[in-house]
Curated annotation (Swiss-Prot):
<keyword id="KW-0566">Pantothenate biosynthesis</keyword>
<feature type="binding site">
    <location>
        <position position="117"/>
    </location>
    <ligand>
        <name>Mg(2+)</name>
    </ligand>
</feature>
<comment type="similarity">
    <text>Belongs to the PanB family.</text>
</comment>
<comment type="function">
    <text>Catalyzes the reversible reaction in which hydroxymethyl group from 5,10-methylenetetrahydrofolate is transferred onto alpha-ketoisovalerate to form ketopantoate.</text>
</comment>
<feature type="binding site">
    <location>
        <position position="85"/>
    </location>
    <ligand>
        <name>3-methyl-2-oxobutanoate</name>
    </ligand>
</feature>
<dbReference type="Pfam" id="PF02548">
    <property type="entry name" value="Pantoate_transf"/>
</dbReference>
<dbReference type="GO" id="GO:0015940">
    <property type="term" value="P:pantothenate biosynthetic process"/>
</dbReference>
<dbReference type="InterPro" id="IPR003700">
    <property type="entry name" value="Pantoate_hydroxy_MeTrfase"/>
</dbReference>
<keyword id="KW-0808">Transferase</keyword>
<feature type="active site" description="Proton acceptor">
    <location>
        <position position="184"/>
    </location>
</feature>
<keyword id="KW-0479">Metal-binding</keyword>
<comment type="subunit">
    <text>Homodecamer; pentamer of dimers.</text>
</comment>
<dbReference type="InterPro" id="IPR015813">
    <property type="entry name" value="Pyrv/PenolPyrv_kinase-like_dom"/>
</dbReference>
<protein>
    <recommendedName>
        <fullName>3-methyl-2-oxobutanoate hydroxymethyltransferase</fullName>
        <ecNumber>2.1.2.11</ecNumber>
    </recommendedName>
</protein>
<feature type="binding site">
    <location>
        <begin position="46"/>
        <end position="47"/>
    </location>
    <ligand>
        <name>3-methyl-2-oxobutanoate</name>
    </ligand>
</feature>
<dbReference type="InterPro" id="IPR040442">
    <property type="entry name" value="Pyrv_kinase-like_dom_sf"/>
</dbReference>
<comment type="pathway">
    <text>Cofactor biosynthesis; (R)-pantothenate biosynthesis; (R)-pantoate from 3-methyl-2-oxobutanoate: step 1/2.</text>
</comment>
Length: 274
């Protein structure tokens, strides 16, 4: 069996120029498939709020939601590095609150690292969690928990001052001890500049080809998600169509009494005549 992916593995991949692969999972069977395929990193994202719980944003997602889904994923995984999102307001009140919640995702959920959104304003919290022995992944650019403050799901860092802030935030988070950095919806030139100037791996989502790795929401790239698909998503399969075809075939066969047939039914044992 391949060696488990760790923070050291991720740094090694960056140093060697080997691209890191990452996708999301929120349940046991999906995580098992991803792990068996050899994905390097699995994110149990608070995106589960929109993808599987039906919320309009990530903001209503709770710590209990995150622990519940992280547990399911961690039971399935043998090799991949599991990162769990810290949900909205689970690390903003105090360092003590942040460390307690981060510890729960590791100890109860089975995650290997936690992910926090934000830059310089959360650097001291990141450092406190790292100093407690918990690996932290940073997240800059479009940060969904701040979607109302950002004015919607828009590309960040297009203007010079904004780009400078994102770059500086990346350096500050590196100093705070992050093990990796997610860059979301920023110009590829900015992502390239950050990637070349920090020692930790960058994982891009809508950040161009120059990051050390890439992540997408699994439901988006497999064609399960309904509604708007972001520009940066490439759809690799149409699982929704496969599901619809299968379900419609089942409905038809049940209604026409074609299922269950003899092959899928049980019969009484035939007794030998005495």
């Amino acid at each position: 069996m391949e060696e488990k992916v760790s923070t050291l593995t991720l740094r090694k991949f960056k140093k060697e120029g080997r691209k890191i692969t990452a996708l999301t999972a929120y349940d046991f069977p999906t995580a098992k498939i991803l792990d068996n395929c050899g994905i390097d990193m699995i994110l149990v994202g608070d995106s589960l709020g929109m993808v599987v719980l039906g919320y309009e944003s990530t903001i209503p997602v709770t710590m209990e939601d995150m622990i519940h889904h992280t547990k399911a994923v961690s039971r399935a995984v043998n090799r991949a590095f599991i990162v769990a999102d810290m949900p909205f307001m689970s690390y903003h009140i105090s360092k003590e609150q942040a460390m307690t919640n981060a510890a729960r995702l590791i100890a109860e959920g089975g995650a290997h690292a936690v992910k926090l959104e934000g830059g310089e304003e959360i650097a001291s919290i990141v450092k406190a969690i790292v100093d407690a022995g918990i690996p932290v992944v940073g997240h800059l650019g479009l940060t969904p928990q701040s979607v109302h403050q950002l004015g919607g799901y828009k590309v960040q860092g297009k203007e010079k001052e904004q780009a400078k802030k994102i770059f500086n935030d990346a350096k500050v988070l590196e100093q705070a001890g992050i093990c990796a950095l997610v860059l979301e919806s920023i110009p590829m030139e900015l992502a390239k500049n950050i990637t070349e100037n920090i020692s930790v791996p960058t994982i891009g989502i809508g950040a161009g080809p120059y990051c050390d790795g890439q992540i997408l929401v699994t439901h988006d790239m497999l064609g399960i998600t309904q509604g708007h698909r972001p520009k940066f998503v490439k759809q690799y399969a149409d699982i929704e169509k496969i599901m619809i075809d299968g379900i419609n075939a089942y409905i038809k066969e049940v209604q026409q009494v074609l299922f269950p047939d003899e092959e899928h039914s049980f019969t009484l044992e035939k007794r030998e005549n005495k």
